[in-house]
Amino acid sequence: ISSQVRHIDFMPTILDMLDIKINDSFEKLDGESLLPLLNGEHREEKFAFSETGNPLNKNAPPKIPNTKSIRNSKWKLIHNEYNDTMEFYDLENDPNEENNLIGKNLEEEKKFLDELLKYTNN
């Protein structure tokens, strides 16, 4: 698989490979099976969301504030809650994340911010 995948896709993939169906009364899994991708099919890339304890303040407990990010294979948006800063990177042209593009009025920035808010407001 050459496209970005998410760790939440592993369980649905394994269940799909083993032909194990999820009971409809169970809560829906967040991920999706990667089996179609393994079989050469194409699917639209999904956003990958991550959240980690606060790496910017070593004295703060690891609960909150956190650092949250959302990405696809081209772009990555990071929100540092500790100091309420944002970072936005073009991963294709800046894989080391050295050129923060936040506030450069890129159309993608708003799209990613909206997606991040969807994840964090659920």
Predicted segments with their positions:
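Carboxylate-dense, calcium-coordinating segments in secreted/extracellular and ER-lumen proteins
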Residues: 97-101
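Intrinsically disordered, low-complexity polar regions and short flexible loop motifs
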Residues: 94
